Amino acid sequence: VLDHLVAHDTYHGPTGVRYGPDPRHLLDVYQPEGGTVPGNAPVVLFFYGGNWTSGERAEYRFVGEALAANGIIAVVADYRLSPQVHYEGFLADCALALQWTLANAASLGGDPARVMVMGHSAGAYNAAMLALDPRWLAPLGLTPSRLAGWIGLAGPYDFLPIVDPHVQVAFGWPHTPADSQPLFYANAKAPSTLLLAARNDKV
């Protein structure tokens, strides 16, 4: 419903851009409308939620529009889902999407030094792991220090033991390691963090 309310005159940008080899490795870019994008615009890579089992980037145009309307370049990426892959797979996909975003930020009119990751619900977990656990960016020659910060919207950051059957599959429960949890990596040297949750959100 929200996507039908999006004001399409506030953004432009390429859609269906490939960032990796899998059919799910696609992203859309939302650049602020109204002239040339300044070369120092902040860039936000957004990961949607859906219990790691569902979701499509086309369902989140309202996120891209909201960011673009405020002068922010938004990138909304699809990633592989469970049961096709376990958590290692979708985190590797998110790392690839971030690599693409960092490499293309300047050509989109953004500042490569002002790139952030943001996610909602399950997507907030993905964003947190890229920002806190260096294992996912290391194979790409990147570190979390490349991020200007990360934003988590109603995300799960410490959810062992796992009780949801779908999430159990995604994380290989009961053999889920403790270092699969973002809280395991919380430290004072992490990128700047903004965590948001609704007042009446039940955890």
What do the PLM-derived regions correspond to, one by one?
Residues 1-38:
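N-terminal cap/lid segment of alpha/beta-hydrolase-fold proteins
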Residues 96-165:
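Primarily recognizes the serine-hydrolase "nucleophile elbow" in alpha/beta-hydrolase
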Residues 58-76:
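Short amphipathic alpha-helix adjacent to the substrate-entry channel of hydrolases
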Residues 194-197, 201:
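Short beta-strand/loop motif that positions the catalytic acidic residue
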Residues 44-46, 74, 193:
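Hydrophobic beta-strand anchors of alpha/beta hydrolase catalytic cores
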Residues 6, 22, 155-185, 191:
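Mobile cap/lid helix-loop segments that gate and shape the active-site cleft of serine hydrolases
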Residues 39-50:
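Short beta-strand element of the alpha/beta-hydrolase
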Residues 144-148, 188-193:
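Short, proline-enriched alpha-helix->beta-strand connector loops that line the catalytic pocket
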